[in-house]
Amino acid sequence: MDRIVEIEKVSFESEFEVSLRPSSFDDYIGQEKIKQNLDVFIKAAKKRGECLDHVLFYGPPGLGKTTLAHIIANEMAVSIKMTAAPMIEKSGDLAAILTNLQEGDVLFIDEIHRLSPAIEEVLYPAMEDFRLDIIIGSGPAAQTIKIDLPKFTLIGATTRAGMISAPLRDRFGMDFRLQFYSTAELSRIIQIASVKLGKECDKAAALEIAKRARATPRIALRLLKRIRDFAEVNDEAMISHERAKEGLNALGVNSLGFDEMDIKYLEILLDAKRRPLGLSTIAAALSEDEGTVEDVIEPYLLANGFIERTAKGRIASEKCFETFKIKLNRTKGLFDGE
């Protein structure tokens, strides 16, 4: 099922997202503590004439991990090479990437927790000693060839930090957990982006979109792009509050940022009446894979206190019952009459 609020777990930014991407910490809205710390570490590395230590970003998708990697490269005045762990199937794939890096380059690996143990073994000496160990042959006749690599900064990104092996995680000099964005931060992002798109939002419209964007910039920008279409076909020079509400309702995104998949998820838990349900049971009921449920659907519901994870499974919170139980039993849908 296609969802306007869904974010792919492994994806590089679209041309649309790239065109709106900030290029410096000054332009980047949100994640203030992370920006402040990175700014210090980058300035210190440049002052010493060294590469920045390896960096790990983790957190739900769409919060700006890729954007921060690009800003780091910009601030260090170096090139950035992009890849994703599922694309690195063999040690030779990683060797080809590493040997093509230039001195000081940034290597960005998305969903780094999906690297196989064999690939990790190749990566360890590259991260620690900037050296590539290639084994030729097998058994007693096997030989190891050592190839020196240029010094580089590895930036790993993941939505599943708990699945990163301890040896790999220990080799990162710094790690940062990205937080969900406030409505005010998203509203600013939307207003700036709307100007770049040539269809400016008024403040009320930007705030309305922000409230329904699941605290996630990528979703906010996706919603803005679609709302712009509603304004365009109505020959409106600016996106008004009423037009934003109309478009968001038409897209099936309610006032809390929930769509039909979220509501179906919550209905499953509410029908269980506080009886814990396992991830596999919920995924089967939604006809989704477990990874999508855990990485894409649940984080926002957890962060906002609508569900709870227990040792026995997931349950609907008291807040969920208070907020939705009556609405979910109505004949009228959650998306009607917003």
From Swiss-Prot:
Self-association state and partner proteins as the record states: Homohexamer. Forms an RuvA(8)-RuvB(12)-Holliday junction (HJ) complex. HJ DNA is sandwiched between 2 RuvA tetramers; dsDNA enters through RuvA and exits via RuvB. An RuvB hexamer assembles on each DNA strand where it exits the tetramer. Each RuvB hexamer is contacted by two RuvA subunits (via domain III) on 2 adjacent RuvB subunits; this complex drives branch migration. In the full resolvosome a probable DNA-RuvA(4)-RuvB(12)-RuvC(2) complex forms which resolves the HJ.
List positions binding DNA: R309, R314
EC number of the protein: 3.6.4.-
Residue positions annotated to bind Mg(2+) are T66
Q: Work out whether the entry's keyword set contains Nucleotide-binding.
A: yes
Task: For the region Small ATPAse domain (RuvB-S), give the residue spans.
Answer: 182-252
Q: Positions of the region Head domain (RuvB-H)?
A: 255-338
User: What does it do?
Assistant: The RuvA-RuvB-RuvC complex processes Holliday junction (HJ) DNA during genetic recombination and DNA repair, while the RuvA-RuvB complex plays an important role in the rescue of blocked DNA replication forks via replication fork reversal (RFR). RuvA specifically binds to HJ cruciform DNA, conferring on it an open structure. The RuvB hexamer acts as an ATP-dependent pump, pulling dsDNA into and through the RuvAB complex. RuvB forms 2 homohexamers on either side of HJ DNA bound by 1 or 2 RuvA tetramers; 4 subunits per hexamer contact DNA at a time.
Query: Which superkingdom does the taxonomy of this entry point to?
Result: Bacteria
Its cellular-component GO annotations read: cytoplasm; Holliday junction resolvase complex
Q: What is known of its domains?
A: Has 3 domains, the large (RuvB-L) and small ATPase (RuvB-S) domains and the C-terminal head (RuvB-H) domain. The head domain binds DNA, while the ATPase domains jointly bind ATP, ADP or are empty depending on the state of the subunit in the translocation cycle. During a single DNA translocation step the structure of each domain remains the same, but their relative positions change.
**What family does this chain come from, according to its entry?**
Belongs to the RuvB family.
* Gene Ontology biological process terms, A to Z: DNA recombination; DNA repair
Give the molecular function GO annotations. ATP binding; ATP hydrolysis activity; four-way junction DNA binding; four-way junction helicase activity
- State the reactions this protein catalyses: ATP + H2O = ADP + phosphate + H(+)
In terms of PANTHER family, this protein maps to:
HOLLIDAY JUNCTION BRANCH MIGRATION COMPLEX SUBUNIT RUVB, PTHR42848
Region feature Large ATPase domain (RuvB-L), mapped onto this chain: 1-181
**Keyword DNA damage listed:** yes
Chief location: cytoplasm
Question: Which residues bind ATP per the record?
Answer: L20, R21, G62, K65, T66, T67, E128, D129, F130, R171, Y181, R218
What does the UniProt entry say about where the protein is found? Answer: Cytoplasm
Put simply, this protein is called Holliday junction branch migration complex subunit RuvB
Alphabetically list the UniProt keywords.
Answer: ATP-binding, Cytoplasm, DNA damage, DNA recombination, DNA repair, DNA-binding, Hydrolase, Nucleotide-binding
